[in-house]
Amino acid sequence: MINSIIEKYQFSKKQIEAVLTLLEEKNTVPFIARYRKEQTGGLDEVQIKQIDDEYQYMVNLQKRKEEVIKNIEQQGLLTEELKKDILKQNKLQRVEDLYRPFKQKKKTRATEAKRKELEPLAIWMKARKHEVSIEEKAQQFINEEVQSVEDAIKGAQDIIAEQISDNPKYRTKILKDMYHQGVLTTSKKKNAEDEKGIFEMYYAYSEPIKRIANHRVLAVNRGEKEKVLSVKFEFDTTSVEDFIARQEINHNNVNRSYILEAIKDSLKRLIVPSIEREIHADLTEKAENHAIDVFSENLRNLLLQPPMKGKQILGVDPAFRTGCKLAVINPFGTFIAKGVIYPHPPVSKKEAAEKDFVQMVKAYDVQLIAIGNGTASRETEQFVADLIKKHQLPVQFIIVNEAGASVYSASEIARDEFPDFQVEERSAVSIGRRVQDPLSELVKIDPKSIGVGQYQHDVNQKALENALTFVVETAVNQVGVDVNTASSSLLQYVSGLSSQIAKNIIAYREENGAIKHNKELSKIKRLGAKTFEQSIGFLRIVDGSEPLDNTSIHPESYKVTYQLLDKLGFGGNDLGSDALKAKLNSLDMDELAIELQVGVPTLEDIIKSLKAPNRDPRDEFDTPILKSDVLSIEDLKEGMKLSGTVRNVVDFGAFVDIGVKQDGLVHVSKLSKKFVKNPMDIVSVGDIVDVWVYSIDKNKDKVSLTMIDPHE
């Protein structure tokens, strides 16, 4: 099993064995990645998960191999060669192909023919020598159930067809040939409805199977599911027929034509449809896995957007008829005030809306306005921009992706937090908090509702959920969590913690006040020694009695850390000071590691934390663009240079918010002068990028952008 992981991922045997042992000992992936680098050779969370996933697949594969071997052995049909063949397979489907001839079959044409005792005729038909004609031989098999020579011959052919279909050697060859030579074709179904022409490019479409892109596989699948498209695989079986005939028909066999008919029937009725299903399933699985990877990467970048720290924010949930809901939150995310204004039709109380809005901004010293990007967003943005200009308000605004805000607002979490609020009022608070601390707010929402994926509703939902949960867990643990201020929604993603333990932490805080030292955590229900070990490195205790509790240094390394500080003449209160940084920069890591009897990777991490105890990995990402004016599509001209925020990355390019109603598309071919296979190699969600307007379609409200400077 380990060898197959080495072959697939190029990790060393030592690394793989270390990861499997650590996982067996109930260590979490974030804990292993952060605090067991000496054992793993510095593998990150994704690599550790790859080892775990592949190992679990191999365990299940081995279990299935043993089941198959046992079943064949019980039939008395297991040969040493077959056993070796089964054991060497590394794909489940190939094991099933080898097992196929020995499976208990449902009622088929061949099983019926065997029941009618026609198997001897099939064996005779394939034999080298024949003393009588096939018609004479078939005559011997006529009975109550086999009423004619034709029926007997047909039954024998059915048996031969199924034997050919069950041959794993033929299936492997056909699978390979069809994948490399076959063509996927699609056409529009008669009377199918596709009002918006979503699937127009697939009305008469064909592409070699081996070249079809992942996003096209999912588009075709959706079109088929919505009964707009018919999907077929085209494959010329002539060469395969010849190949099988050479294996199955003895030289000078007078029954050649009958066996050829059986071969053609086997291909058309049994093998090709089965292989088509397998290829379709493989293409779909590959495309779904890729879509999940795209969604995961986009979500990771969204979660790790830098927080807007220290700002008083006004969140706005725009709407027409029901009014724009307003909510002010302070720099700590605490709700301060709420209101509702009706600047848009059909109510159109614009003067009153202006008065109330300006009054709220001034009364609460609002520094930033966060506007949701849903219904009436464009009109609200214009309204806010006009007021900033007219009243010379010292504020800027930002457009916030509000996907999932309504899901959160109607959730139990939101009802518990704001029991007396309307759903839209909760949304306004959530929109404001999304800017202030995206990670803390977005963890309250089912990741699938955040909407930064591609065909996310078309993929395996369980696989998607597992992948996205892993992304959220990784992001939360990379950033770290303040144990005294974090919500239970955030705490439950901390390494080692469950939703129940997260609630117990909240209950403890409410009863006892702020936690001051890591040892206090042992008083919390269900937070035992193992849970403490797995979680404490990712929890932060701000203004506690132990300075190291506010760093990512694990308590298991506190002794070494204080030995280091003592050696340099510093104490726990000197963390992050310029003097300490200067001393730390002049150290010989290898010598020091030997002296302190600690691994170099752990020592490097300790020193990073001592230099920057409050380091936040999100600070490395681009900060969002703040605005005080708006653009319309009429303002755009081809060649115009703009700065924008990447909102979504898909296989065919990236959608960039440039401040007009619709996000502009930078096609994959316009991301760089060089060939780009994967847009994610160039851009990520949240990136601030320079773009130029490539083309404008005002009728469709579409803007095409390029990241290639047209003047170069």
Residue ranges of model-derived segments:
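Generic start-of-chain signal for non-secretory N-termini
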Residues: 1-17, 24
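Feature marking long nucleic-acid-engaging regions of large polymerase/nuclease enzymes
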Residues: 18, 27-42, 352
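Duplex nucleic acid-engaging cores and interfaces of nucleic-acid transaction enzymes
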Residues: 47-50, 57, 61, 66-315, ...
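Long, highly charged, low-complexity intrinsically disordered interaction regions
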Residues: 53, 60-77, 87, 416-425, ...
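Structured, non-catalytic alpha/beta "coupling" segments that mediate domain-domain communication
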Residues: 71, 98, 223-236, 248-271, ...
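A glycine-rich phosphate-binding loop feature that marks nucleotide/adenosyl-phosphate handling sites
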Residues: 176-183, 316-320, 375-376, 400-407, ...
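Single-stranded RNA-binding regions, centering on S1/OB-family and related RNA-binding modules
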Residues: 544-545, 549-712
